[in-house]
């Protein structure tokens, strides 16, 4: 999957994993990146899947920082 822009408001991407532990490991790694960037995505975690949702809360929309964070999450 790739990132999608939803309603011109936020970025979304889904990842698939072989099990819950792998999905959790990815989410934890993503959280470390979010903390380092001081820009925090919303995550939905389930068995073998993770969804990330990114937008800038201050403007209730997208900024360059959202795309930078998305690119960094792609490198995990």
Task: Show the residue positions of the predicted features.
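Long, contiguous binding/interaction regions
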Residues: 1-14, 18-24, 28-76
């Amino acid at each position: 999957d790739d990132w999608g822009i939803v309603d011109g408001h936020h970025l979304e991407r889904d990842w698939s994993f072989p099990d819950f532990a792998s999905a959790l490991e990815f989410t934890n790694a993503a959280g470390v990146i979010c903390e380092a960037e001081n820009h925090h995505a919303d995550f939905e975690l389930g068995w073998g899947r993770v969804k990330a949702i990114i937008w800038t809360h201050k403007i209730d929309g997208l900024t360059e920082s959202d795309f930078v964070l998305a690119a960094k999450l792609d490198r995990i």
